[in-house]
Amino acid sequence: MEEQVLSLLEELCEDEVVREDLDINLRDEGLLDSLGFVEMLVRMEEVFGFATAPTEVTYEEIDTPRRVMAYVKKRVAAL
């Protein structure tokens, strides 16, 4: 699952730094803007089978690759 998350982030951010630094802030580093954030939520639904409305999660909750992976694990476990 972690590999799938990292692949998704690498594709969305168009940068492999997301694999190298799991604590990089995706927004602060200019890797993911607000549109990218929404696209990430849509792609997570497609890949992992859970839906998340943009109002259900704040950017700060999933602002690094490590936090995105933790969020996905939590949501998949709840299915």
Curated annotation (Swiss-Prot):
One of its GO terms (molecular function) is D-alanyl carrier activity. The modification O-(pantetheine 4'-phosphoryl)serine is found at S34. It holds the Pfam family PP-binding. 4'-phosphopantetheine is transferred from CoA to a specific serine of apo-DCP. PROSITE patterns: CARRIER. It is found in: Cytoplasm. Residues 1-76 form the Carrier domain. One of its GO terms (biological process) is lipoteichoic acid biosynthetic process. Keywords: Cell wall biogenesis/degradation, Cytoplasm, Phosphopantetheine, Phosphoprotein. It comes from the Bacteria. InterPro entries: ACP-like_sf, DltC, PP-bd_ACP. Pathway: Cell wall biogenesis; lipoteichoic acid biosynthesis. One of its GO terms (cellular component) is cytoplasm. Gene3D superfamilies: ACP-like (1.10.1200.10). Carrier protein involved in the D-alanylation of lipoteichoic acid (LTA). The loading of thioester-linked D-alanine onto DltC is catalyzed by D-alanine--D-alanyl carrier protein ligase DltA. The DltC-carried D-alanyl group is further transferred to cell membrane phosphatidylglycerol (PG) by forming an ester bond, probably catalyzed by DltD. D-alanylation of LTA plays an important role in modulating the properties of the cell wall in Gram-positive bacteria, influencing the net charge of the cell wall. Belongs to the DltC family. This is D-alanyl carrier protein. It comes from Abiotrophia defectiva. The gene is dltC.
